[in-house]
Structure formats: C-alpha cells, structure tokens
C-alpha cells in the first residue's frame, strides 16, 4: 500500500506540473519568434546604395489604378498605409507597392522582429528602433489578435481573381489548423485536470481503480497534446509557404524558430505521458508480483 501511494503521489505531482506548464504555454505568446536584426544589418551593409531600408518608416498610399473621375473616391484612396502594416493592407496595395519598386529586392520589404502565440502576434520591444518609433507615433500596433474566424476579404479588390481565390483558400485552411491546435490543447488541459482529480481521489477511495483510470486520462491528454503541437507546426510551415511569397515568406537571413512557450508545451507532454505510463503499468506489475508470490506460497505448501 505504501508503494502504491508513493507511485500515486509521484504521478500526481508530475501531472500537476505538466498542467501548470501547459496552461503557461497556452496563455503566453512566445510560440514562434522571428529575429530580423541580421537581415537589417545585411541590408544596411550590402544595400546601402539603394533606398530600401528607408521604406521602414515611409508610408504608402492607396493609388487608384484607373482615374474614375470621382475626386472624393480618389482622395479616400490616398489614405496612408504603412508598409509594416498588416498583410491585408499590403495585399490591398500590392500593385501600387510593386509599381513603386519597394518589393523588387528582399531588402525592399520592411521586416521587424516578432513573437507570436495562440492568441496574439506582437513586435519585440526595444529590439528595433524603427518599429518602436512607429508604435509610439500610433502608426503600428504593438500586438494584433490572431484570427480564429473566417471573414470575407472585402479589401482584396485590387488583386487578380485567381490570386484572390488562392489567398482565401489558404486563409481557410490556416484557420482550420489554428482551430484544431487551440481546441485540442484545451481538451488536453481539461482531461489532464480530470486525471489529476481522479488521482487525488485515489488516496481516499479504491486506489487501484482510480490509479488505472487516471493513467488512461493522462495518456488521452498526451494524445490530444501531441495532435495540437503537430498541427501547430504544420500551420507555421503552411503560413510561411503561402502566396504571394513577398507578403508571407521570409528571407533566408531572417532567423526564425520556436520559442520557450512551445518548449513548455513539449515538456508538459513528456510529463503527462510519463505519469500516464506509471499509473497504468504499476497496477499490472503489482498484480503480477502478487500472483507470483501467491503461486510460490501454494507450491511450497
């Protein structure tokens, strides 16, 4: 009984630690990070003859493709849009941007260091003076929400029909991947909490049964967590390979990778699976040992 209680206590401690790490991962924003400092240094060093890096603080305007004769409409189209704005605004003005020669080179697209999680995408503070100035002036926002709902892209009127359809389909698939990631992470946390409660109840009632049930719940939570983490990795790869590449892709000298939040999620997965294996295998091992000792006593008699 003492060994069984010790095993239950160890598995319960591991599951609670795993739950804390998973909740930390869910509510923090360092799942994926990009560092553009090396890209900026290369552009400043090798692209000094061009005006590429000046575009980081230069506003772009809606340029009408055809003069419709409507002065009010043309004036409305001249609203300034910064090149570091959201992807939808860059897509809106993609022809004007290409016409100005801003995206002819990799240095023409202004890139800033970012970190993102399940709910927000933010710019690093204090890493790039340009984006800090833009945020201070109110031109850019420090953080933007990650979309989990599909909205009709009414701003894509300046884009060819085939490219518009491609963007819409990619957006739809990406939203599905995001929903799967968030949904399975939520289920993993809920099942893990239920398993911890069942394991705690095992100290007072039917320890063998509750230990087995909690182990199965921990393994189920591990499956959910594995699905969500793999889906998140797929969504990141899918997002970086979207069209048009000058909006969604990253140059080769931009450092990007997973952050400490997803590391917490992977550690949580390991602890969850370990506690589940302990809780499910120990009852079988103890039962087998008891049967062997009983058989040995009967044979000796």
Swiss-Prot record:
Keywords: Endoplasmic reticulum, Glycoprotein, Membrane, Signal, Transmembrane, Transmembrane helix. Pfam families: Claudin_2 (PF13903). It is a multi-pass membrane protein. Residues 26-183, 237-258 are extracellular. It is found in: Endoplasmic reticulum membrane. Glycans are attached at residue 162. GO terms for cellular component: endoplasmic reticulum membrane. It comes from the Eukaryota. Residues 205-215, 280-301 are cytoplasmic. One of its GO terms (biological process) is negative regulation of osteoclast differentiation. Its main location: endoplasmic reticulum. Belongs to the TMEM178 family. May act as a negative regulator of osteoclast differentiation. PANTHER family: TRANSMEMBRANE PROTEIN 178A (PTHR32005:SF4), TRANSMEMBRANE PROTEIN 178B-RELATED (PTHR32005). This is Transmembrane protein 178A. It comes from Danio rerio.
